[in-house]
């Protein structure tokens, strides 16, 4: 064992002694090239950011408002808005609040639409929320994820005094939808890279929680199933 250890130790020493001297000039040259390339790439980020911001600010949406849809299947739009609550949506390019009724009850639709998402005006933001946590009248009671035929949504119960609402919320980024803000950010990057689209939306449906949760959820699902395809087409056209 001593012999074997000595053999490897001697062999390594011989290898080190016989190894060619490193070409420090070549290494310095390559290091300089890599450093210059890295600095060039890094320097492009502010320029890219500036261009994206400039394009966002210079590109005005063709629509001055989100078009109103008079009915989704059996759900008819009220000519007079009857809102009792609104989500907090920070600096959307366009905003819509409408109330729809059927023999099942009433549903409020809210959309905050961002034609060109940019710093301070984007669908996924801590400024966009269902209630004001700092002294607002409405409070979040509970939240859970609910499956639909298209994609899961975030279901939240909010309350004020003796009144409660059941709210469904999700994001639309380009033509991709999710309730998750993390996945929505990924979708935003994906749409920017592969389709050049920068539009996004913060969407909620709400209904009074006067009876049991199952009945209120059934109303939301009925409206959702009859409205989602038309809403998607509407927002897709706005994002062109």
Language model segments and positions:
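Membrane-interface transmembrane-helix boundary segments in multi-pass integral membrane proteins
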Residues: 1-4
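Membrane-interfacial, low-structure loops and terminal tails that flank and connect transmembrane helices
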Residues: 7-31
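Internal/C-terminal transmembrane anchor helices
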Residues: 23-53
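Short extracytoplasmic
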Residues: 68-98
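A cross-kingdom signal targeting lumenal/periplasmic-facing segments of multi-pass membrane
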Residues: 96-239
């Amino acid at each position: 064992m001593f012999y074997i250890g000595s053999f490897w130790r001697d062999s390594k020493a011989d290898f080190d002694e016989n190894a060619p001297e490193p070409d420090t000039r070549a290494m310095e040259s390559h290091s300089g090239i890599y450093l210059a390339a890295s600095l060039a790439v890094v320097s492009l980020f502010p320029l890219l950011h500036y261009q994206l911001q400039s394009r966002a600010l210079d590109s005005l949406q063709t629509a001055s408002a989100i078009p109103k849809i008079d009915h989704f299947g059996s759900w008819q739009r009220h000519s007079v808005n009857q809102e009792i609550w609104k989500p907090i949506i920070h600096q959307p390019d366009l905003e819509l609040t409408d109330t729809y009724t059927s023999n099942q009850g009433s549903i409020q639709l809210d959309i905050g639409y961002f034609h060109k998402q940019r710093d301070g005006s984007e669908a996924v933001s801590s400024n966009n929320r269902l209630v004001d946590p700092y002294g607002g009248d409405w409070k979040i009671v509970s939240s859970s994820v609910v499956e639909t035929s298209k994609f899961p949504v975030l279901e939240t119960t909010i309350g004020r005094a003796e009144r409660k609402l059941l709210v469904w919320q999700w994001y639309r980024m380009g033509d991709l939808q999710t309730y998750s803000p993390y996945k929505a950010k990924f979708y935003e990057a994906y749409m920017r890279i592969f389709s050049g689209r920068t539009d996004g939306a913060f969407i909620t449906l709400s209904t009074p929680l006067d009876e049991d949760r199952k009945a209120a959820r059934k109303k939301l699902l009925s409206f959702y199933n009859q409205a989602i395809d038309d809403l998607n087409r509407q927002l897709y056209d706005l994002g062109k």
